[in-house]
């Protein structure tokens, strides 16, 4: 069993994968999207297929008061589009063994702050954070989901 974490950034979509035991999340790269992260769905579908992903965890960027702003609504639409594409892939598949991965949203407030802190603690120069902060945020999102399954 493998889970995929997704952080929808403005320039990049960060990805993280779990280990098969669902214990640890690790960075799995970025998809450069330049503001249109709906473009990333094709790439995410490739990762899902290549890594045999069972569950996709998408960060939901709620505002600090818990309400949904524009970014959260975009994340919901993105996750819904991913689910539709997965359903279509399932219907087009000849395999009777194909299981559609579950897609879930998880509150990602302060994950970018946490990601920057982790990168700083790893002695990564702050000017080097930008290219990796989205995938590190995806790690935080996915690790949060993994930890909640064990609680």
From Swiss-Prot:
- Which Enzyme Commission numbers does its entry carry? 3.1.-.-
Its subcellular locations are: Cytoplasm
Give Gene Ontology CC terms.
cytosol
What is the superkingdom listed in this entry's lineage? Bacteria
Which InterPro entries would you find in this protein's record?
RNaseH-like_sf, YqgF, YqgF/RNaseH-like_dom, YqgF/RNaseH-like_dom_sf
**GO MF terms, alphabetically ordered:** nuclease activity
Q: Which keywords describe this protein according to UniProt?
A: Cytoplasm, Hydrolase, Nuclease, Ribosome biogenesis
BP terms from Gene Ontology: rRNA 5'-end processing
Name the enzyme's class.
hydrolase
Q: Name one Pfam family in it.
A: RuvX
Describe the function of this protein.
Could be a nuclease involved in processing of the 5'-end of pre-16S rRNA.
Cited NCBIfam families: RNAse_H_YqgF
What is stated as this protein's family in its record? Belongs to the YqgF nuclease family.
Q: Which HAMAP family would you find in this protein's record? A: Nuclease_YqgF (MF_00651)
Which protein, by its recorded name, is this? Putative pre-16S rRNA nuclease
Q: Origin organism of this chain?
A: Bifidobacterium longum subsp. infantis (strain ATCC 15697 / DSM 20088 / JCM 1222 / NCTC 11817 / S12)
Question: What broad taxonomic lineage does this protein's source fall under?
Answer: Bacteria, Bacillati, Actinomycetota, Actinomycetes, Bifidobacteriales
């Amino acid at each position: 069993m493998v889970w995929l974490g997704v952080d929808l950034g403005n320039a990049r979509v960060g990805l993280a994968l779990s280990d098969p035991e669902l214990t640890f999340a690790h960075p799995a790269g970025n998809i450069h999207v330049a503001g249109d992260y709906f473009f990333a769905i094709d790439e995410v579908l490739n990762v899902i297929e290549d890594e045999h992903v069972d569950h996709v965890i998408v960060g939901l960027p709620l505002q600090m008061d818990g309400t949904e702003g524009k970014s959260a609504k975009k994340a919901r639409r993105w996750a819904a589009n991913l689910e539709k594409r997965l359903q279509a892939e399932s219907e087009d598949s000849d395999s009777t063994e194909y299981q559609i991965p579950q897609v879930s949203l998880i509150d990602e407030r302060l994950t970018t702050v946490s990601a920057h802190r982790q990168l700083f603690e790893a002695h990564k120069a702050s000017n080097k954070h930008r290219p990796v902060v989205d995938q590190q945020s995806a790690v935080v999102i996915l690790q949060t989901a993994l930890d909640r399954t064990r609680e």
